[in-house]
Amino acid sequence: MAALRRLLWPPPRLSPTLAPQQPFLSPWGRPAGTAPGMSGRPFSGREEDEGAVAEAAWRRRRWGELSIAAAAGGGLVGLVCYQLYGDPRADPSELVAPELDESPRGRGLLPIPVAAAKETVATGRAVTEDLDLYATSRERRFRLFASIECEGQLFMTPYDFILAVTTDEPKFAKTWKSLSKQELSQMLSETPPVWKGSSKLFRNLKERGVISYTEYLFLLCILTKPHAGFRIAFNMFDTDGNEMVDKKEFLVLQEIFRKKNEKRETKGDEEKRAMLRLQLYGYHSPTNSVLKPDAEELVSRSYWDTLRRSTSQALFSDLAERADDITSLVADTTLLVHFFGKKGKAELNFEDFYRFMDNLQTEVLEIEFLSYSNGMNTISEEDFAHILLRYTNVENTSVFLENVRYSIPEEKGITFDEFRSFFQFLNNLEDFAIALNMYNFASRSIGQDEFKRAVYVATGLKLSPHLVNTVFKIFDVDKDDQLSYKEFIGIMKDRLHRGFRGYKTVQKYPTFKSCLKKELHSR
Protein backbone atom coordinates (compact mmCIF):
# COMPACT_ATOMS: atom_id res chain seq x y z
CA MET A 1 0.00 0.00 0.00
CA ALA A 2 2.88 2.35 0.74
CA ALA A 3 4.30 1.78 -2.73
CA LEU A 4 0.89 2.35 -4.30
CA ARG A 5 0.46 5.51 -2.28
CA ARG A 6 3.79 6.85 -3.52
CA LEU A 7 2.77 6.11 -7.10
CA LEU A 8 -0.63 7.78 -6.92
CA TRP A 9 -0.07 10.85 -4.75
CA PRO A 10 1.33 13.95 -6.50
CA PRO A 11 4.64 15.30 -5.19
CA PRO A 12 4.17 18.11 -2.63
CA ARG A 13 5.09 21.66 -3.52
CA LEU A 14 7.91 23.48 -1.80
CA SER A 15 6.68 25.43 1.19
CA PRO A 16 7.67 29.12 1.03
CA THR A 17 8.75 28.99 4.68
CA LEU A 18 11.48 26.45 4.00
CA ALA A 19 14.92 27.69 3.16
CA PRO A 20 16.54 26.43 -0.02
CA GLN A 21 19.36 24.99 2.12
CA GLN A 22 16.88 22.59 3.84
CA PRO A 23 14.68 21.16 1.09
CA PHE A 24 11.69 18.89 1.89
CA LEU A 25 12.22 15.47 0.37
CA SER A 26 9.33 14.12 -1.68
CA PRO A 27 8.28 10.41 -1.85
CA TRP A 28 10.49 10.09 -4.94
CA GLY A 29 13.65 10.89 -2.93
CA ARG A 30 14.26 14.36 -4.47
CA PRO A 31 13.56 17.86 -3.12
CA ALA A 32 9.95 18.79 -3.58
CA GLY A 33 9.34 21.48 -6.17
CA THR A 34 12.26 20.44 -8.35
CA ALA A 35 12.26 18.67 -11.65
CA PRO A 36 14.00 15.30 -11.97
CA GLY A 37 17.72 15.68 -12.58
CA MET A 38 17.88 19.31 -11.27
CA SER A 39 20.10 20.37 -8.40
CA GLY A 40 17.38 21.12 -5.86
CA ARG A 41 17.14 24.85 -6.72
CA PRO A 42 13.56 26.31 -6.30
CA PHE A 43 11.98 27.50 -9.47
CA SER A 44 9.31 29.96 -10.46
CA GLY A 45 7.64 31.34 -13.56
CA ARG A 46 8.68 29.53 -16.70
CA GLU A 47 10.87 27.20 -14.71
CA GLU A 48 7.82 26.29 -12.64
CA ASP A 49 5.86 25.45 -15.80
CA GLU A 50 8.73 23.28 -17.02
CA GLY A 51 8.82 21.59 -13.62
CA ALA A 52 5.10 20.87 -13.79
CA VAL A 53 5.55 19.29 -17.22
CA ALA A 54 8.42 17.18 -15.89
CA GLU A 55 6.36 16.10 -12.91
CA ALA A 56 3.46 15.12 -15.20
CA ALA A 57 5.84 13.04 -17.31
CA TRP A 58 7.20 11.48 -14.13
CA ARG A 59 3.68 10.55 -13.03
CA ARG A 60 2.87 9.06 -16.45
CA ARG A 61 5.99 6.92 -16.26
CA ARG A 62 5.00 5.77 -12.80
CA TRP A 63 1.49 4.90 -14.03
CA GLY A 64 3.05 2.87 -16.86
CA GLU A 65 5.17 0.96 -14.36
CA LEU A 66 2.08 0.34 -12.24
CA SER A 67 0.15 -1.00 -15.26
CA ILE A 68 2.98 -3.39 -16.14
CA ALA A 69 3.14 -4.62 -12.54
CA ALA A 70 -0.64 -5.15 -12.47
CA ALA A 71 -0.54 -7.10 -15.73
CA ALA A 72 2.29 -9.29 -14.43
CA GLY A 73 0.38 -9.90 -11.20
CA GLY A 74 -2.75 -10.84 -13.11
CA GLY A 75 -0.77 -13.26 -15.25
CA LEU A 76 0.71 -14.86 -12.15
CA VAL A 77 -2.74 -15.30 -10.59
CA GLY A 78 -4.01 -16.84 -13.83
CA LEU A 79 -1.09 -19.26 -13.94
CA VAL A 80 -1.68 -20.34 -10.33
CA CYS A 81 -5.40 -20.88 -11.00
CA TYR A 82 -4.59 -22.90 -14.14
CA GLN A 83 -2.21 -25.07 -12.17
CA LEU A 84 -4.81 -25.54 -9.43
CA TYR A 85 -7.85 -26.38 -11.53
CA GLY A 86 -6.37 -27.27 -14.90
CA ASP A 87 -8.03 -27.11 -18.27
CA PRO A 88 -11.63 -28.32 -17.85
CA ARG A 89 -11.27 -30.08 -21.17
CA ALA A 90 -8.11 -31.95 -20.16
CA ASP A 91 -8.01 -35.59 -21.14
CA PRO A 92 -8.51 -37.96 -18.18
CA SER A 93 -5.41 -39.93 -19.18
CA GLU A 94 -3.26 -36.95 -18.20
CA LEU A 95 -4.52 -36.68 -14.66
CA VAL A 96 -1.95 -38.86 -12.95
CA ALA A 97 1.01 -38.18 -15.20
CA PRO A 98 2.90 -36.07 -12.61
CA GLU A 99 2.96 -39.04 -10.27
CA LEU A 100 4.41 -41.42 -12.83
CA ASP A 101 6.52 -39.29 -15.13
CA GLU A 102 9.94 -40.32 -13.93
CA SER A 103 11.99 -43.42 -14.63
CA PRO A 104 15.06 -44.48 -12.65
CA ARG A 105 18.40 -43.90 -14.25
CA GLY A 106 20.20 -47.01 -15.37
CA ARG A 107 17.05 -49.17 -15.29
CA GLY A 108 14.75 -50.58 -17.90
CA LEU A 109 11.70 -49.47 -15.94
CA LEU A 110 9.22 -47.19 -17.63
CA PRO A 111 6.32 -45.18 -16.20
CA ILE A 112 2.89 -45.16 -17.74
CA PRO A 113 3.06 -43.21 -21.01
CA VAL A 114 0.39 -40.57 -21.30
CA ALA A 115 -1.64 -40.77 -24.48
CA ALA A 116 -5.18 -39.78 -25.23
CA ALA A 117 -7.64 -42.26 -26.62
CA LYS A 118 -9.10 -41.51 -30.00
CA GLU A 119 -11.64 -38.76 -29.65
CA THR A 120 -15.15 -40.00 -30.26
CA VAL A 121 -18.58 -38.99 -29.13
CA ALA A 122 -18.52 -38.66 -25.33
CA THR A 123 -21.39 -40.20 -23.43
CA GLY A 124 -22.25 -38.57 -20.09
CA ARG A 125 -22.53 -40.64 -16.94
CA ALA A 126 -25.55 -38.78 -15.56
CA VAL A 127 -28.03 -40.98 -17.43
CA THR A 128 -26.79 -44.22 -15.85
CA GLU A 129 -25.44 -42.89 -12.55
CA ASP A 130 -28.21 -44.55 -10.57
CA LEU A 131 -27.05 -47.98 -11.80
CA ASP A 132 -24.41 -47.86 -9.07
CA LEU A 133 -27.23 -48.56 -6.62
CA TYR A 134 -27.55 -52.04 -8.14
CA ALA A 135 -23.82 -52.73 -8.56
CA THR A 136 -21.34 -54.47 -6.27
CA SER A 137 -18.22 -52.65 -5.08
CA ARG A 138 -16.12 -54.32 -7.78
CA GLU A 139 -18.63 -53.44 -10.48
CA ARG A 140 -18.73 -49.83 -9.30
CA ARG A 141 -14.95 -49.61 -9.42
CA PHE A 142 -14.87 -51.02 -12.94
CA ARG A 143 -17.50 -48.54 -14.10
CA LEU A 144 -15.62 -45.74 -12.35
CA PHE A 145 -12.41 -46.33 -14.33
CA ALA A 146 -13.86 -47.63 -17.61
CA SER A 147 -13.59 -45.13 -20.46
CA ILE A 148 -14.80 -47.03 -23.57
CA GLU A 149 -18.34 -47.99 -24.58
CA CYS A 150 -19.17 -50.18 -27.57
CA GLU A 151 -22.74 -51.23 -28.33
CA GLY A 152 -23.77 -50.76 -24.72
CA GLN A 153 -20.88 -52.68 -23.13
CA LEU A 154 -18.23 -50.89 -21.06
CA PHE A 155 -14.51 -51.54 -21.33
CA MET A 156 -11.34 -50.40 -19.66
CA THR A 157 -8.31 -49.51 -21.70
CA PRO A 158 -4.97 -51.03 -20.59
CA TYR A 159 -4.17 -47.59 -19.19
CA ASP A 160 -7.45 -47.54 -17.23
CA PHE A 161 -6.62 -50.92 -15.70
CA ILE A 162 -3.19 -49.72 -14.55
CA LEU A 163 -4.80 -46.68 -12.94
CA ALA A 164 -7.45 -48.84 -11.27
CA VAL A 165 -4.84 -50.98 -9.50
CA THR A 166 -2.28 -48.26 -8.70
CA THR A 167 -4.41 -45.24 -7.73
CA ASP A 168 -7.18 -44.77 -5.21
CA GLU A 169 -9.69 -43.08 -7.51
CA PRO A 170 -9.86 -41.01 -10.70
CA LYS A 171 -9.11 -37.37 -10.03
CA PHE A 172 -11.92 -36.33 -12.35
CA ALA A 173 -15.02 -38.17 -13.52
CA LYS A 174 -14.50 -39.70 -16.93
CA THR A 175 -16.86 -39.86 -19.83
CA TRP A 176 -17.37 -43.03 -21.80
CA LYS A 177 -16.07 -42.67 -25.34
CA SER A 178 -18.38 -44.45 -27.74
CA LEU A 179 -16.70 -46.69 -30.34
CA SER A 180 -18.27 -48.49 -33.27
CA LYS A 181 -17.47 -52.12 -34.05
CA GLN A 182 -15.23 -50.97 -36.88
CA GLU A 183 -13.30 -48.58 -34.64
CA LEU A 184 -12.90 -51.28 -32.00
CA SER A 185 -11.63 -53.74 -34.61
CA GLN A 186 -9.13 -51.17 -35.87
CA MET A 187 -7.93 -50.56 -32.31
CA LEU A 188 -7.43 -54.28 -31.66
CA SER A 189 -5.42 -54.67 -34.86
CA GLU A 190 -2.48 -53.07 -33.04
CA THR A 191 -2.43 -55.77 -30.34
CA PRO A 192 0.85 -57.74 -30.39
CA PRO A 193 0.84 -61.57 -30.24
CA VAL A 194 1.51 -63.25 -26.92
CA TRP A 195 5.06 -64.23 -27.85
CA LYS A 196 5.89 -60.52 -28.18
CA GLY A 197 4.63 -59.70 -24.70
CA SER A 198 6.74 -57.86 -22.13
CA SER A 199 6.53 -56.22 -18.71
CA LYS A 200 5.64 -52.98 -20.52
CA LEU A 201 2.72 -54.37 -22.54
CA PHE A 202 -0.02 -52.32 -20.89
CA ARG A 203 2.04 -49.13 -20.90
CA ASN A 204 2.96 -49.62 -24.55
CA LEU A 205 -0.66 -50.19 -25.56
CA LYS A 206 -1.73 -47.12 -23.54
CA GLU A 207 -5.33 -46.55 -24.63
CA ARG A 208 -5.17 -48.66 -27.79
CA GLY A 209 -7.02 -51.64 -26.39
CA VAL A 210 -10.02 -52.79 -24.34
CA ILE A 211 -10.48 -55.02 -21.28
CA SER A 212 -13.89 -56.44 -20.33
CA TYR A 213 -15.25 -56.66 -16.81
CA THR A 214 -14.67 -60.41 -16.48
CA GLU A 215 -11.11 -59.99 -17.73
CA TYR A 216 -10.62 -57.21 -15.18
CA LEU A 217 -11.59 -59.66 -12.41
CA PHE A 218 -9.31 -62.33 -13.87
CA LEU A 219 -6.33 -59.95 -14.05
CA LEU A 220 -6.91 -58.94 -10.43
CA CYS A 221 -6.73 -62.63 -9.50
CA ILE A 222 -3.38 -62.87 -11.27
CA LEU A 223 -1.90 -59.95 -9.35
CA THR A 224 -2.40 -61.63 -5.98
CA LYS A 225 -1.41 -65.21 -6.81
CA PRO A 226 2.00 -66.91 -6.41
CA HIS A 227 3.82 -68.33 -9.40
CA ALA A 228 2.84 -71.82 -8.30
CA GLY A 229 -0.79 -70.82 -8.83
CA PHE A 230 -0.14 -70.04 -12.52
CA ARG A 231 -0.03 -73.75 -13.35
CA ILE A 232 -3.30 -74.33 -11.50
CA ALA A 233 -4.95 -71.52 -13.45
CA PHE A 234 -3.72 -72.90 -16.76
CA ASN A 235 -4.83 -76.45 -15.99
CA MET A 236 -8.31 -75.19 -15.10
CA PHE A 237 -8.70 -73.85 -18.63
CA ASP A 238 -7.10 -76.85 -20.35
CA THR A 239 -10.23 -78.99 -20.75
CA ASP A 240 -8.76 -81.77 -22.90
CA GLY A 241 -5.40 -81.96 -21.12
CA ASN A 242 -3.34 -81.33 -24.26
CA GLU A 243 -1.26 -78.60 -22.56
CA MET A 244 -2.90 -75.99 -24.81
CA VAL A 245 -5.81 -73.61 -24.20
CA ASP A 246 -7.98 -72.35 -27.05
CA LYS A 247 -10.37 -69.40 -27.13
CA LYS A 248 -13.50 -71.44 -26.36
CA GLU A 249 -11.87 -72.99 -23.30
CA PHE A 250 -10.73 -69.61 -22.05
CA LEU A 251 -14.20 -68.08 -22.36
CA VAL A 252 -15.52 -70.36 -19.64
CA LEU A 253 -14.43 -67.74 -17.09
CA GLN A 254 -17.00 -65.39 -18.66
CA GLU A 255 -19.81 -67.68 -17.53
CA ILE A 256 -18.25 -68.43 -14.13
CA PHE A 257 -17.82 -64.81 -13.11
CA ARG A 258 -21.22 -63.86 -14.52
CA LYS A 259 -22.95 -66.56 -12.49
CA LYS A 260 -21.17 -65.53 -9.29
CA ASN A 261 -22.37 -61.96 -9.79
CA GLU A 262 -25.95 -63.10 -10.40
CA LYS A 263 -26.00 -64.52 -6.86
CA ARG A 264 -24.96 -61.18 -5.43
CA GLU A 265 -27.23 -58.92 -7.46
CA THR A 266 -29.26 -56.39 -5.50
CA LYS A 267 -32.99 -56.93 -5.78
CA GLY A 268 -34.87 -54.09 -7.32
CA ASP A 269 -35.68 -52.60 -10.70
CA GLU A 270 -35.29 -55.45 -13.19
CA GLU A 271 -34.81 -53.02 -16.06
CA LYS A 272 -31.91 -51.30 -14.28
CA ARG A 273 -30.26 -54.61 -13.41
CA ALA A 274 -30.62 -55.76 -17.00
CA MET A 275 -28.97 -52.55 -18.19
CA LEU A 276 -26.13 -53.09 -15.72
CA ARG A 277 -25.58 -56.66 -16.97
CA LEU A 278 -25.49 -55.36 -20.52
CA GLN A 279 -22.82 -52.80 -19.57
CA LEU A 280 -20.66 -55.39 -17.81
CA TYR A 281 -21.06 -58.45 -20.05
CA GLY A 282 -22.29 -57.11 -23.37
CA TYR A 283 -25.33 -59.40 -23.40
CA HIS A 284 -28.25 -60.34 -21.16
CA SER A 285 -28.13 -63.50 -19.06
CA PRO A 286 -29.12 -66.58 -21.06
CA THR A 287 -32.14 -68.52 -19.86
CA ASN A 288 -30.11 -71.75 -19.56
CA SER A 289 -26.85 -71.13 -17.75
CA VAL A 290 -23.81 -73.25 -18.45
CA LEU A 291 -23.32 -73.71 -14.71
CA LYS A 292 -25.68 -75.64 -12.48
CA PRO A 293 -27.06 -73.95 -9.37
CA ASP A 294 -24.65 -74.08 -6.46
CA ALA A 295 -26.02 -75.80 -3.36
CA GLU A 296 -23.92 -73.50 -1.18
CA GLU A 297 -25.51 -70.29 -2.36
CA LEU A 298 -24.90 -68.50 0.92
CA VAL A 299 -21.19 -69.30 1.13
CA SER A 300 -19.15 -66.26 0.12
CA ARG A 301 -16.08 -67.19 -1.91
CA SER A 302 -13.37 -65.23 -3.63
CA TYR A 303 -13.34 -65.09 -7.42
CA TRP A 304 -10.29 -67.33 -7.45
CA ASP A 305 -12.07 -70.00 -5.37
CA THR A 306 -15.14 -69.65 -7.56
CA LEU A 307 -13.03 -70.12 -10.68
CA ARG A 308 -11.27 -73.15 -9.22
CA ARG A 309 -14.46 -74.84 -7.94
CA SER A 310 -16.66 -74.06 -10.93
CA THR A 311 -14.39 -74.73 -13.89
CA SER A 312 -14.56 -78.52 -13.66
CA GLN A 313 -18.35 -78.34 -13.41
CA ALA A 314 -18.56 -76.07 -16.43
CA LEU A 315 -16.21 -78.15 -18.53
CA PHE A 316 -18.40 -81.25 -18.26
CA SER A 317 -21.71 -79.47 -18.70
CA ASP A 318 -23.36 -78.31 -21.88
CA LEU A 319 -20.47 -75.91 -22.58
CA ALA A 320 -19.50 -77.81 -25.70
CA GLU A 321 -23.00 -77.39 -27.11
CA ARG A 322 -23.14 -73.68 -26.31
CA ALA A 323 -19.48 -72.81 -26.96
CA ASP A 324 -20.22 -71.28 -30.35
CA ASP A 325 -23.10 -69.25 -28.90
CA ILE A 326 -20.91 -67.87 -26.12
CA THR A 327 -18.12 -67.04 -28.57
CA SER A 328 -20.53 -65.12 -30.79
CA LEU A 329 -21.91 -63.18 -27.82
CA VAL A 330 -18.54 -62.12 -26.40
CA ALA A 331 -16.83 -59.19 -28.11
CA ASP A 332 -13.16 -59.47 -28.99
CA THR A 333 -10.83 -57.78 -26.53
CA THR A 334 -7.13 -57.03 -26.26
CA LEU A 335 -6.61 -60.08 -24.06
CA LEU A 336 -8.39 -62.45 -26.47
CA VAL A 337 -6.49 -61.12 -29.49
CA HIS A 338 -3.20 -61.19 -27.55
CA PHE A 339 -3.72 -64.84 -26.53
CA PHE A 340 -5.51 -66.31 -29.55
CA GLY A 341 -4.69 -64.06 -32.50
CA LYS A 342 -6.86 -61.77 -34.60
CA LYS A 343 -8.84 -64.69 -36.00
CA GLY A 344 -9.15 -66.46 -32.67
CA LYS A 345 -7.64 -69.67 -34.04
CA ALA A 346 -4.31 -69.67 -32.16
CA GLU A 347 -3.76 -71.70 -29.00
CA LEU A 348 -2.05 -70.68 -25.78
CA ASN A 349 0.68 -72.84 -24.20
CA PHE A 350 1.72 -72.76 -20.56
CA GLU A 351 5.06 -71.01 -21.15
CA ASP A 352 3.39 -68.03 -22.83
CA PHE A 353 0.62 -67.99 -20.22
CA TYR A 354 3.16 -68.03 -17.37
CA ARG A 355 5.20 -65.25 -18.99
CA PHE A 356 2.10 -63.07 -19.41
CA MET A 357 1.09 -63.44 -15.75
CA ASP A 358 4.63 -62.81 -14.49
CA ASN A 359 4.98 -59.75 -16.75
CA LEU A 360 1.69 -58.31 -15.48
CA GLN A 361 2.77 -58.63 -11.85
CA THR A 362 6.13 -57.05 -12.68
CA GLU A 363 4.57 -54.17 -14.62
CA VAL A 364 2.23 -53.17 -11.80
CA LEU A 365 5.08 -53.35 -9.27
CA GLU A 366 7.32 -51.25 -11.53
CA ILE A 367 4.67 -48.56 -11.78
CA GLU A 368 4.14 -48.47 -8.01
CA PHE A 369 7.89 -48.31 -7.45
CA LEU A 370 8.36 -45.53 -10.02
CA SER A 371 5.62 -43.43 -8.48
CA TYR A 372 7.83 -43.04 -5.39
CA SER A 373 11.39 -43.34 -6.74
CA ASN A 374 11.54 -39.87 -8.39
CA GLY A 375 13.99 -41.13 -10.99
CA MET A 376 16.27 -42.89 -8.53
CA ASN A 377 17.13 -46.59 -8.31
CA THR A 378 15.75 -46.85 -4.78
CA ILE A 379 12.80 -45.66 -2.73
CA SER A 380 13.06 -44.57 0.89
CA GLU A 381 12.12 -46.88 3.74
CA GLU A 382 9.28 -44.50 4.63
CA ASP A 383 7.91 -44.63 1.08
CA PHE A 384 8.09 -48.43 1.26
CA ALA A 385 5.96 -48.23 4.40
CA HIS A 386 3.48 -45.94 2.59
CA ILE A 387 3.09 -48.51 -0.19
CA LEU A 388 2.63 -51.42 2.21
CA LEU A 389 -0.06 -49.61 4.19
CA ARG A 390 -1.78 -48.12 1.17
CA TYR A 391 -4.65 -50.58 0.71
CA THR A 392 -4.97 -51.77 4.30
CA ASN A 393 -7.67 -51.01 6.84
CA VAL A 394 -5.20 -49.40 9.23
CA GLU A 395 -6.78 -46.16 10.41
CA ASN A 396 -3.73 -44.50 11.97
CA THR A 397 -0.77 -45.12 9.68
CA SER A 398 1.24 -42.34 11.34
CA VAL A 399 2.27 -44.74 14.14
CA PHE A 400 3.93 -47.08 11.65
CA LEU A 401 5.54 -44.26 9.69
CA GLU A 402 6.88 -42.76 12.90
CA ASN A 403 8.45 -46.12 13.71
CA VAL A 404 10.41 -45.95 10.46
CA ARG A 405 11.58 -42.36 10.98
CA TYR A 406 12.71 -43.07 14.53
CA SER A 407 14.28 -46.50 13.91
CA ILE A 408 15.97 -45.78 10.55
CA PRO A 409 17.22 -42.17 10.78
CA GLU A 410 19.72 -42.65 7.94
CA GLU A 411 18.04 -43.63 4.69
CA LYS A 412 19.62 -46.55 2.84
CA GLY A 413 16.82 -47.18 0.37
CA ILE A 414 14.92 -50.18 -0.99
CA THR A 415 15.89 -51.40 -4.48
CA PHE A 416 13.37 -52.63 -7.02
CA ASP A 417 14.67 -56.20 -6.71
CA GLU A 418 14.05 -56.08 -2.94
CA PHE A 419 10.67 -54.45 -3.55
CA ARG A 420 9.62 -57.13 -6.03
CA SER A 421 10.84 -60.04 -3.90
CA PHE A 422 8.80 -58.81 -0.95
CA PHE A 423 5.57 -58.65 -2.95
CA GLN A 424 6.25 -62.08 -4.42
CA PHE A 425 6.47 -63.24 -0.82
CA LEU A 426 3.13 -61.53 -0.04
CA ASN A 427 1.51 -63.55 -2.82
CA ASN A 428 2.59 -66.64 -0.84
CA LEU A 429 1.18 -65.22 2.39
CA GLU A 430 -1.12 -68.17 3.07
CA ASP A 431 1.77 -70.65 3.09
CA PHE A 432 3.84 -68.30 5.20
CA ALA A 433 0.99 -67.89 7.70
CA ILE A 434 1.05 -71.63 8.32
CA ALA A 435 4.75 -71.49 9.10
CA LEU A 436 4.30 -68.40 11.28
CA ASN A 437 1.49 -70.05 13.22
CA MET A 438 3.88 -72.83 14.15
CA TYR A 439 6.13 -70.25 15.80
CA ASN A 440 3.12 -68.51 17.31
CA PHE A 441 1.57 -71.69 18.68
CA ALA A 442 2.75 -70.88 22.22
CA SER A 443 1.78 -67.22 21.87
CA ARG A 444 5.30 -66.15 21.10
CA SER A 445 6.59 -63.78 18.46
CA ILE A 446 9.52 -64.35 16.11
CA GLY A 447 12.75 -62.49 15.48
CA GLN A 448 14.34 -61.47 12.20
CA ASP A 449 16.35 -64.67 11.69
CA GLU A 450 13.28 -66.83 12.32
CA PHE A 451 11.25 -64.63 9.98
CA LYS A 452 13.75 -65.05 7.14
CA ARG A 453 13.88 -68.80 7.70
CA ALA A 454 10.08 -69.09 7.66
CA VAL A 455 9.88 -67.07 4.42
CA TYR A 456 12.44 -69.30 2.73
CA VAL A 457 10.76 -72.53 3.88
CA ALA A 458 7.29 -71.39 2.78
CA THR A 459 8.14 -69.59 -0.47
CA GLY A 460 11.72 -70.38 -1.47
CA LEU A 461 12.53 -66.64 -1.49
CA LYS A 462 15.54 -65.12 0.25
CA LEU A 463 14.79 -61.62 1.54
CA SER A 464 17.74 -59.28 2.12
CA PRO A 465 18.67 -58.48 5.76
CA HIS A 466 17.99 -54.77 5.18
CA LEU A 467 14.51 -55.49 3.78
CA VAL A 468 13.63 -57.74 6.73
CA ASN A 469 14.96 -55.16 9.18
CA THR A 470 12.82 -52.46 7.51
CA VAL A 471 9.69 -54.63 7.75
CA PHE A 472 10.35 -55.21 11.44
CA LYS A 473 10.84 -51.50 12.08
CA ILE A 474 7.52 -50.74 10.36
CA PHE A 475 5.34 -53.29 12.15
CA ASP A 476 7.10 -53.68 15.50
CA VAL A 477 4.79 -51.27 17.33
CA ASP A 478 5.83 -52.36 20.83
CA LYS A 479 9.51 -52.02 19.85
CA ASP A 480 10.61 -55.42 21.14
CA ASP A 481 12.29 -56.35 17.82
CA GLN A 482 9.80 -59.21 17.49
CA LEU A 483 6.93 -59.76 15.06
CA SER A 484 3.59 -61.39 15.84
CA TYR A 485 0.67 -62.56 13.74
CA LYS A 486 -1.44 -59.58 14.80
CA GLU A 487 1.32 -57.08 13.97
CA PHE A 488 1.97 -58.37 10.48
CA ILE A 489 -0.20 -61.09 8.94
CA GLY A 490 -3.53 -59.43 9.73
CA ILE A 491 -2.46 -56.15 8.12
CA MET A 492 -0.81 -57.76 5.09
CA LYS A 493 -3.91 -59.80 4.27
CA ASP A 494 -5.68 -56.49 3.64
CA ARG A 495 -2.80 -55.34 1.42
CA LEU A 496 -2.88 -58.56 -0.56
CA HIS A 497 -6.49 -58.02 -1.66
CA ARG A 498 -5.71 -54.71 -3.30
CA GLY A 499 -8.23 -55.14 -6.10
CA PHE A 500 -11.12 -56.76 -4.29
CA ARG A 501 -11.63 -54.45 -1.34
CA GLY A 502 -12.34 -50.78 -0.95
CA TYR A 503 -9.47 -48.45 -1.61
CA LYS A 504 -8.20 -46.39 1.28
CA THR A 505 -7.57 -42.76 0.45
CA VAL A 506 -4.03 -41.82 1.41
CA GLN A 507 -3.22 -38.40 2.82
CA LYS A 508 -0.60 -36.78 0.65
CA TYR A 509 2.03 -34.40 1.87
CA PRO A 510 0.72 -30.81 2.09
CA THR A 511 1.81 -28.64 -0.77
CA PHE A 512 1.48 -25.00 -1.69
CA LYS A 513 -1.15 -25.97 -4.25
CA SER A 514 -3.38 -27.78 -1.75
CA CYS A 515 -3.02 -25.01 0.83
CA LEU A 516 -3.88 -22.32 -1.69
CA LYS A 517 -6.84 -24.29 -3.04
CA LYS A 518 -8.19 -24.73 0.49
CA GLU A 519 -7.80 -21.01 1.16
CA LEU A 520 -9.60 -20.06 -2.07
CA HIS A 521 -12.53 -22.39 -1.30
CA SER A 522 -12.88 -20.96 2.20
CA ARG A 523 -13.47 -17.43 0.92
UniProtKB/Swiss-Prot annotation:
The keyword Transit peptide applies. SMART domains: EFh. It is found in: Mitochondrion intermembrane space; Mitochondrion inner membrane. The gene is Micu3. Residues 1-6 form a transit peptide. Signal peptide: none annotated. Pfam families: EF-hand_7. Keywords: Calcium, Disulfide bond, Membrane, Metal-binding, Mitochondrion, Mitochondrion inner membrane, Repeat, Transit peptide. Ca(2+) 1 binds at D238, D240, N242, M244, D246, E249. InterPro entries: EF-hand-dom_pair, EF_Hand_1_Ca_BS, EF_hand_dom, MICU1/2/3. EF-hand domains 1 and 3 have high affinity for calcium and act as sensors of mitochondrial matrix calcium levels. EF-hand domain 2 is degenerate. Ca(2+) 2 binds at D476, D478, D480, Q482, E487. This is Calcium uptake protein 3, mitochondrial. Residues 225-260, 414-429, 463-498 form the EF-hand domain.
